[in-house]
């Protein structure tokens, strides 16, 4: 017999259930060699067809041999059908020629270390064994041991009923016959339900004929020919090209015979996207000049009048200010005059790119007093039958009024005194921000220096909520200030005692106690030192 191999060539571990393949006598694990032979009945090392497997070797005369009934011949043309046919015959309904090829010992694999099946196809058999052995034995530990014994017996004897009955009789006694019968049925179902297919054997190096290689190269050159997408005519077509020129020349004549349709021009942008504004006529210009807004009631002022308001903040798209900005002013319901942009241009003496955009929010009365709320104030320069007049003033006068209306802090206004421009009760009202673009060539350009913007008023919580869609944010988390130590000078005696106690503890931890002097015996005896 051959010597025992140090490691299995398949799993590279110490061989369990030492086995050898005949006739080459190469040593493997029993599980590894049986799995290998089911896929390819040749030796993994020397590629010699395996005739039998010797396993459970106790001595030179005591061992077990399992024969491989497949006669594998490399030179024959039926080498694939001879081994594959015995495993695929189960699907066709015919019994295989050698039944030990699919229900013999090589069809079963021992359990893994964790108690699961060694092969996925045997897992239903292991599940059945778990249920059946739990019914026959009392403890789960004993059932686990019997499960391993049953699977090892199947790996050695296969579905041999006589041998299984003889092996299981000392353990199952009167339950041996029904258990073996059910075990064989379950084992054959698991093995026969999934026939084992062999791995395709390699044919080695295949040499290609030179004639076939030349033909393939010609096909590759034909496929590499570039095709001009502009010239897709048939190369065999020999028709004259003049016919195509004549047909192309006649094409525009046929198109000219059709009635011409007016093509729509590019869309123009109006005030609303996707709609074309109608051409303004003389009546529409006059109506735009005298257009007035409908009066709106203000619940805060209860219908009282506070002064004249001229709104000149309309942009080119016709959008007005947000409702929250205008609603924050304590104003009255006055008609608003929208000036005509076409006639306002020639009124300015100087025309330049930097035109003056005036945002006149309110106007001060000569006495700097508010009119009574019960008496409405008529607009300046307008009467019942007359057309309202535009306020005409110089740029310097407007600058003075604008700075008087600008928002400022109450502390700054009080410190400045009444000598400052616009000092009065109306100077501290919250007004919206206004930006004035001044013509540099006009009068008073040096006062502004180009662009002039006042401080932006901070929005209130209600205004911010309306801008977010009436969604209120939860208040921010405020940091808690550190709690100081209790004051000794407090009137409460409990607080004074606690503060004094805290300071005493701090003083005690900061000072270190003095080390006591070591008492020594004059004779330096260890007994005296130990007693101390």
From Swiss-Prot:
A zinc finger (RING-type) spans 8-47. Gene3D superfamilies: Zinc/RING finger domain, C3HC4 (zinc finger). PROSITE patterns: ZF_RING_1, ZF_RING_2. Auto-ubiquitinated. Signal peptide: none annotated. One of its GO terms (molecular function) is ubiquitin protein ligase activity. Zn(2+) 1 binds at residues 8, 11, 29, 32. The keyword Amino-acid biosynthesis does not apply. Residues 206-391, 406-426, 461-498, 510-532 are annotated as: Disordered. The keyword Transferase applies. It catalyses: S-ubiquitinyl-[E2 ubiquitin-conjugating enzyme]-L-cysteine + [acceptor protein]-L-lysine = [E2 ubiquitin-conjugating enzyme]-L-cysteine + N(6)-ubiquitinyl-[acceptor protein]-L-lysine. Keywords: Activator, DNA-binding, Early protein, Host-virus interaction, Inhibition of host innate immune response by virus, Inhibition of host IRF3 by virus, Inhibition of host mitotic exit by virus, Inhibition of host RLR pathway by virus, Metal-binding, Modulation of host cell cycle by virus, Modulation of host ubiquitin pathway by viral E3 ligase, Modulation of host ubiquitin pathway by virus, Repressor, Transcription, Transcription regulation, Transferase, Ubl conjugation, Ubl conjugation pathway, Viral immunoevasion, Zinc, Zinc-finger. Zn(2+) 2 binds at residues 24, 26, 43, 46. One of its GO terms (biological process) is symbiont-mediated perturbation of host exit from mitosis. InterPro entries: Znf_C3HC4_RING-type (IPR018957), Znf_RING (IPR001841), Znf_RING/FYVE/PHD (IPR013083), Znf_RING_CS (IPR017907). It is an enzyme of class 2 (transferase). Its EC number is 2.3.2.27. Residues 217-227, 234-243 have a biased composition (Acidic residues). Residues 286-295 have a biased composition (Basic residues). Transmembrane segments: none annotated. Evades nuclear antiviral defenses triggered by dsDNA viruses. Acts during the initial stages of lytic infection and the reactivation of latent viral genome. Prevents the antiviral effect of nuclear bodies by degrading host PML and SP100. This is E3 ubiquitin-protein ligase ICP0. It comes from Equine herpesvirus 1 (strain Ab4p) (EHV-1).
């Amino acid at each position: 017999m051959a010597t025992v191999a140090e490691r299995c060539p398949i799993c590279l571990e110490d061989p369990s259930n030492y086995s050898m393949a005949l006739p080459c006598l190469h040593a493997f694990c029993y599980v590894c060699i049986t799995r290998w032979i089911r896929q390819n009945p040749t030796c993994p090392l020397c590629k010699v067809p395996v005739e039998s497997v010797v396993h459970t070797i106790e001595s030179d005369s005591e061992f077990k041999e399992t024969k491989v009934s497949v006669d594998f011949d490399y030179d024959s043309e039926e080498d694939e059908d001879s081994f594959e046919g015995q495993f695929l015959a189960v699907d066709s309904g015919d019994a295989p020629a050698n039944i030990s090829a699919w229900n013999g010992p090589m069809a079963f694999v021992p359990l893994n270390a964790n108690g699961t099946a060694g092969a996925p196809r045997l897992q239903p058999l292991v599940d059945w064994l778990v249920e059946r052995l739990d019914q026959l034995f009392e403890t789960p530990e004993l059932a686990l041991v019997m499960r391993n014994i049953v699977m090892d017996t199947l790996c050695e004897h296969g579905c041999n009923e006589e041998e299984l009955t003889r092996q299981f009789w000392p353990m199952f006694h009167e339950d041996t016959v029904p258990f073996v019968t059910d075990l064989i049925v379950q084992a054959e179902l698991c093995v026969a339900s999934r026939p084992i297919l062999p791995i395709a054997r390699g044919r080695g190096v295949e040499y290609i004929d030179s004639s076939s290689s030349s033909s393939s190269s010609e096909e590759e050159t034909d496929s590499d020919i570039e095709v001009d997408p502009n010239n897709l005519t048939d190369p065999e077509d020999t028709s004259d090209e003049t016919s195509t020129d004549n047909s192309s020349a006649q094409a525009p004549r046929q198109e000219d015979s059709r009635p011409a349709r007016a093509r729509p021009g590019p869309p123009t942008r109006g005030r609303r996207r996707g709609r074309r504004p109608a051409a303004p006529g003389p009546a529409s210009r006059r109506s735009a000049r005298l257009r007035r807004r409908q009066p709106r009631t203000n619940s805060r002022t209860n219908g009282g009048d506070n002064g004249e308001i001229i709104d000149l903040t309309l942009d080119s798209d016709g959008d007005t200010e947000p409702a929250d900005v205008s609603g924050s002013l304590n104003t009255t319901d006055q008609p608003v005059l929208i000036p005509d942009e076409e006639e306002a241009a020639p009124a300015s003496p100087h025309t330049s790119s930097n035109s003056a955009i005036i945002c006149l929010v309110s106007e001060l009365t000569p006495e700097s007093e508010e009119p009574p709320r019960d008496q409405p104030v008529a607009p300046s320069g307008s009467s019942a039958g007359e057309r309202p007049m535009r306020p005409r003033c110089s740029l310097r006068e407007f600058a003075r009024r604008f700075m008087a209306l600008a928002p400022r802090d109450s502390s700054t206004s009080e410190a400045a005194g009444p000598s400052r421009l616009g000092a009065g009760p109306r100077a501290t009202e919250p007004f919206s921000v206004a930006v004035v673009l001044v013509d540099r060539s006009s009068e008073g350009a040096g006062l502004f220096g180009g662009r002039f913007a006042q401080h932006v008023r901070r929005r209130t919580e209600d205004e911010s909520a309306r801008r977010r869609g009436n969604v209120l944010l939860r208040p921010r988390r405020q940091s808690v200030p550190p709690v100081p130590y209790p004051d000794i000078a407090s009137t409460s005696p409990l607080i004074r005692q606690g503060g004094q106690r805290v300071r005493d503890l701090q003083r005690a931890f900061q000072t270190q106690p003095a080390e006591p002097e070591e008492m020594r015996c004059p004779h330096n005896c260890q007994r005296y030192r130990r007693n101390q």
